[in-house]
C-alpha cells in the first residue's frame, strides 16, 4: 500500500482523470487511487495522507457519490491526517457556485481534526463566488475547470502536486 490515498467521485470522468494525473506525477508507489463510490470508512482511515477529489454540480451541489459518503466521512477521526483537496467546477455557467463542494468537504473534515494543505490561488479564474475559498485570494484546494479552461489543467495539476509534495514533506517521508 502506498502512503497516500487519492479518493475521487466522478460522473463525467473529469475528476477521475485529474486523480490519475496526480497519481502519475506522484508515482504509483506513493499514491493509490480509489473511487469513493467503492470505498469504505476503513479505506480512508488506512492513510495518513489523503487527497480528496470532489466536483461541484449545478448550484453548488457535491457529486452524488460524495454526497452519499458524507455520513461516513462524518464518522472518521481526521486527527493526525494531512489532507489536500481538489475539485472540478464550471466558472462560467455556475459562476456563483464555482467549486463550492471543496468548501462542503472542508467543513466536514476540518472540525474532525484534518490538517488541510494545498491552498491554491484564485488568480486566473473568473467566478463570482465560491464556498471553496480559504481566503479572498486562495481556494482551499486545487480548482479545475475542464469546461472553460481545459488547456490550463495539466500545468495547474503539475504545479499543485509540486506544491503539496513540499507542504507534505513527501521527499523526507519517502527517504526516512
Curated annotation (Swiss-Prot):
FMN binds at residues 10-15, 56-60, 90, 94-99, 147. It comes from the Bacteria. InterPro entries: Flavodoxin, Flavodoxin/NO_synth, Flavodoxin_CS, Flavodoxin_lc, Flavoprotein-like_sf. Its cofactor is FMN. It holds the Pfam family Flavodoxin_1. Keywords: Electron transport, Flavoprotein, FMN, Nucleotide-binding, Transport. Residues 4-165 form the Flavodoxin-like domain. One of its GO terms (molecular function) is electron transfer activity. Binds 1 FMN non-covalently. Monomer. Belongs to the flavodoxin family. The structure is significantly stabilized upon cofactor binding. This is Flavodoxin 1. The lineage of its organism: Bacteria, Pseudomonadati, Pseudomonadota, Gammaproteobacteria, Enterobacterales.
Amino acid at each position: 500500500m502506498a502512503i497516500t490515498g487519492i479518493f475521487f467521485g466522478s460522473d463525467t470522468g473529469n475528476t477521475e482523470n485529474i486523480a490519475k494525473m496526480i497519481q502519475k506525477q506522484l508515482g504509483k508507489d506513493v499514491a493509490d487511487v480509489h473511487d469513493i463510490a467503492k470505498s469504505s470508512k476503513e479505506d480512508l482511515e488506512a492513510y495518513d495522507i489523503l487527497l480528496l477529489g470532489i466536483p461541484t454540480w449545478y448550484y453548488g451541489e457535491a457529486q452524488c457519490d460524495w454526497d452519499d459518503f458524507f455520513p461516513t466521512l462524518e464518522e472518521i477521526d481526521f486527527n493526525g491526517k494531512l489532507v489536500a483537496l481538489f475539485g472540478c467546477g464550471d466558472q462560467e455557467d455556475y459562476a456563483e457556485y464555482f467549486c463550492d463542494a471543496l468548501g462542503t468537504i472542508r467543513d466536514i473534515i476540518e472540525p474532525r481534526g484534518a490538517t488541510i494543505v494545498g491552498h491554491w490561488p484564485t488568480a486566473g479564474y473568473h467566478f463570482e463566488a465560491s464556498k471553496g475559498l480559504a481566503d479572498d485570494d486562495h481556494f482551499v484546494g486545487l480548482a479545475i475547470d475542464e469546461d472553460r479552461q481545459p488547456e490550463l489543467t495539466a500545468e495547474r495539476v503539475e504545479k499543485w502536486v509540486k506544491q503539496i509534495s513540499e507542504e507534505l514533506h513527501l521527499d523526507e517521508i519517502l527517504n526516512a
